[in-house]
Amino acid sequence: MVIQIIPAFSSVTRSSNARLQEHHLEQVAILIGIIKQHVRNFVPQIFDLVNELWDIASLQLPLVTLVEALGKALDAEFRPFLPSILPRLLKVFEGELTDKRTATQIKVFQAFLTFGSNIEEYMHLVIPVIVKSYERPDGSILLRKTAITTIEGLSQRVNFSDHASRIIHPLVRVLSYQNNELRMAVMDTLCALVHQLGSDFAIFVPTINKVSLTYMA
């Protein structure tokens, strides 16, 4: 049955208009969530579809949702596909920050968490876009908070030892922003980093204390 459904969905999606394409992509993502690892034989075909449709801006959100579903279904088996899809996901963070792009970026952050430890070797590429997102003043509170909590979530999946400084200093700068929701997200994330880094976190404590006393007293 699956052998018939996946090719059929791919064919119909290619030949439909953009509105129907979005619906079909959502259905494929749901199907992947049902059949889970049994989708493995169709992954190359699905990625062909993703690559073919990626440049259609209105489809990027459902395409990221589809990629996230694949990452969740395949778990460790998803690792070989990351080099081909990650550049596309990172490119979502370029250009003007529209409402649609913001929603897609948030979905990419959720996908990063789904990829889990598979993404660890690409942290040097992933961390800059996360940091940029939680620091950017034109970003929505939801986008910035999601970026911050993505660091918290990833801290349970990957080793941040080599990236602590480039993560923590920007987080501390966010504490100066007059928004309690962001500040609480930062504090929760810093606590998660303390848990992972242990004594290596001590070097950052004076700076955190100074900023906390200045802006959160």
Task: Please tell me what each predicted stretch does.
Residues R19, H38, D55, L59, ...:
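Alpha-helical structural elements of signaling/regulatory helical domains
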Residues Q21, Q60, R101-Q105, S140, ...:
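Residue-level detector of extended alpha-helical repeat arrays and alpha-solenoid scaffolds
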